[in-house]
C-alpha cells in the first residue's frame, strides 16, 4: 500500500507542477553547461588552427545585407550583424544572409467577383523589403513566399468588396487600402510593404461591348442636347434680329440688299428691279397706313 500511495502522490497535479520547473531548470542548466564546453572547445580549435581558422571565422556581408547568427541553435545576442566583417565560431555557429533591398512582386491575374456580381481579372505589383532581418528568419519559414501568397489573397479580398465602377475609378484608393492591410499583416514577419499598384483590370468581352454601346449612346445623347441648345440659341437670335429689323425700315432695306448681293454672287446672275426700292418702300408704308385707318374705323 505504501508503494501504491507513493506512486499516486507522484502523479497528482500539484506534485507535477512543483517538479516541472525544477526539471526544466535542470535541463537548462545541463544545456548551458554543455554549451559552455562546446564554445570552449571551439575557441581551442580556433587557437590551434591559427591562422587558417581566420579564413573560416571571419565573414563579410554587403551594405545591403545583414547576417543572422545562430549559436547552438539559439540567436546570438546583439541582433543581426553587418554591414562589414563579423566573426563566427566554427562548428557551433551558423548564419543566414538577409537581403534588405526592396523587391518587386508581380501578382498574377486574379479572377475576382465584384460586389455587384461582375467577374473581372485583376493583377497588381507589390513593392516590399525586409525591415527586421532577425524576425524575418526566426518568425517565419519563408518570409518572401508568405508575403507573395498574402498579396494574392489580399487582392482578391479587397476587390471582392468593391463595385465595378469603384475598381475602375478609384485605383489609387484601393491600392492604398491594400498597402495598409499587407503592411499590418506582414509586420510580424519583419516585412515592410512600401507600395502596391494595380496594373490592369480586364473585363469580359460581352461587358466591354455593353459598356462601349452605353458610352456611344451617352455621346449621341450629349450631341443631340448640344444641337438642340444651338438651335434654341439661333432661334432666339433670329427673333431678336427680326424685332430689330421690324423697328427699323433702313435695316430691312440693308438686309434686303445684302441678301441680293449674296444671291448674285453665288449664281453669277444679274437681278433687274422694275421699281426703285424707295418706291417699294413708299407703297409698303401706304399699305400699312391704309390698313391702320380701316382698323380704327
Curated annotation (Swiss-Prot):
PROSITE patterns: BAND_7
A GO CC term assigned to this protein in UniProt: plasma membrane
Keyword presence, Transmembrane: yes
Membrane topology classification: Single-pass membrane protein
Main location: membrane
Pfam families linked to this entry: Band_7 (PF01145)
InterPro entries in the cross-refs: Band-7_stomatin-like, Band_7, Band_7/SPFH_dom_sf, Band_7/stomatin-like_CS, Stomatin_HflK_fam
Compositionally skewed regions (Polar residues) per UniProt: 1-13
Membrane spanning stretches: 37-57
UniProt keyword list: Membrane, Transmembrane, Transmembrane helix
The keyword Cytoplasm is assigned to this record: no
Region called Disordered, residue ranges: 1-30
Protein's cellular compartments: Membrane
Family, similarity comment: Belongs to the band 7/mec-2 family.
Name the UniProt record assigns to this protein: Band 7 protein AAEL010189
Species this protein is from: Aedes aegypti (Yellowfever mosquito)
